[in-house]
Amino acid sequence: MERLVIRMPFCHLSTYSLVWVMAAVVLCTAQVQVVTQDEREQLYTPASLKCSLQNAQEALIVTWQKKKAVSPENMVTFSENHGVVIQPAYKDKINIAQLGLQNSTITFWNITLEDEGCYMCLFNTFGFGKISGTACLTVYVQPIVSLHYKFSEDHLNTTCSATARPAPMVFWKVPRSGIENSTVTLSHPNGTTSVTSILHIKDPKNQVGKEAICQVLHLGTVTDFKQTVNKGYWFSVPLLLSIVSLVTLLVLISILLYWKRHRNQDREP
């Protein structure tokens, strides 16, 4: 009598594990990767955002959308059949600078604060559906800096103001002794921020001929702004009052002498 013997592989668990690993590798390999890069550009200059489909998948249409609170907003599409199609709200504002179904670049002609945000590029591929990537655009404004000083009776006020986006930071390069500092921050409707720092120096005479150095930090870069304190602008209030009083007294004496002289002349026969 024959017996049917079924031999099970000794390493069946390892074989099954290997199958699962291979399936996972195939699945991961099949996943399409989209490479993007965030950009930071200056206000009122051109800007570009790029998207690249890394895997050799067949894309049929490329769509760019702007992310918004409710739902993404279509901006522009590109396909071989229809070419570039720009939505009315974005005409004369953007264009697709790189025409391709694997690599796509949109260009803003002149960015404004409204253009700041994140954008999605969607590759509509055959067999894998829509594969998307996200690139974000940040808008900045270079600092506009003013530096001036003013003498008063017993102290010197030096003011440094910087307006930029994002908000700048203002420092002073001065000795620590006898100096007080106050800072005011003001946000503007156009998205910029003004930071004003005022130095109160108690011994103004010692600052004559020296430089007032204001340091502005913006986007990781520190810039020095210098101004030499001119003694021609310095005066002492008590000294000024003394001079004015002396001049007034001399004028009164002159008037009195002139009046007496003419009075004596009138009395002579």
UniProtKB/Swiss-Prot annotation:
Residues 31-236 are extracellular. Disulfide bonds join 51-121, 118-136, 160-214. It is a single-pass type I membrane protein. Costimulates T-cell proliferation. May regulate myeloid cell activity in a variety of tissues. The chain crosses the membrane at residues 237-257. Residues 31-141 form the Ig-like V-type domain. This is OX-2 membrane glycoprotein. Glycans are attached at residues 103, 110, 157, 181, 190. CD200 and CD200R1 interact via their respective N-terminal Ig-like domains. GO terms for molecular function: cell-cell adhesion mediator activity.
